[in-house]
Amino acid sequence: YHGRALMIAAGSCAVNCRYCFRRHYPYGDEPRRLDDWEPALEQLRTDSSISELLLSGGDPLMLTDARLGQLIERLEAIPHLRRLRIHTRIPIVLPDRVTDQLLAMLTESRLTPIVVVHSNHAAEVVADCEAALRRLVRAGVTVLNQAVLLRGVNDSVDALAELSESLINVGVMPYYLHQLDRVAGAAHFEVDPDVGRRLIAELRKRLPGYAVPRYVQEIAGEAHKTVIE
């Protein structure tokens, strides 16, 4: 991506999402030791156009605080990196993972931290999850949410509005609503894009603008997400 790079930091997740577009990714080939990241780190060092690194997976927060801290230290030593973005579902499904050590690691880094969580329904944002998200926000971390539009789960104005409000109430910005990626075994979750467009139009009538996520789709070969207008 222009100005950005993505690194698969871990091959495991705390939960198996049936609609995940990386469900068949060869995670067994991913680095298991810190030195195994060195080729990727060297590539980052040599490309001064990259100012933001995305840690993805799997789930980066499946790494221990110690291992994640070692990786962040190496990233901090790359002078042209300015921001660290972590894509994770852990604060939603395993909120105790948001430890004091993790918060200190993120907020004391010279890299500006951004955490993108993944919640699809307000029923996921329960008390423990709310507390974990508030801890991140109050520590000064920018926290965004991305959701997937799923038939029978959140394909109604009420469900999407409730999700946005539950996130906004704890300081998390609804960022993206993804059209389902067509992965094997997930066809029953797919919502017609015209339905998605109507849902977004209704959300705009009901919610303040900042609480309405962008409706987007991943298209193979494109260098960015495509907004569904």
Where do the model's predicted regions map?
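Conserved AdoMet/S-adenosylmethionine-binding subsite of the radical SAM
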Residues: 38-52, 61-207
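Surface-exposed cleft-lining segments at the edges of enzyme active sites
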Residues: 27-29, 57-58, 86
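C-terminal accessory regions of radical SAM enzymes
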Residues: 197-229
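Iron-sulfur (Fe-S) cluster-binding segments and ferredoxin-like electron-carrier domains
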Residues: 20-32
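Hydrophobic positions in the central parallel beta-sheet of the AAA+
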Residues: 7, 53-55
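Short, flexible loop/turn elements at secondary-structure junctions
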Residues: 11-13, 59, 90, 121, ...
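N-terminal pre-triad scaffold of radical SAM enzymes
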Residues: 1-21
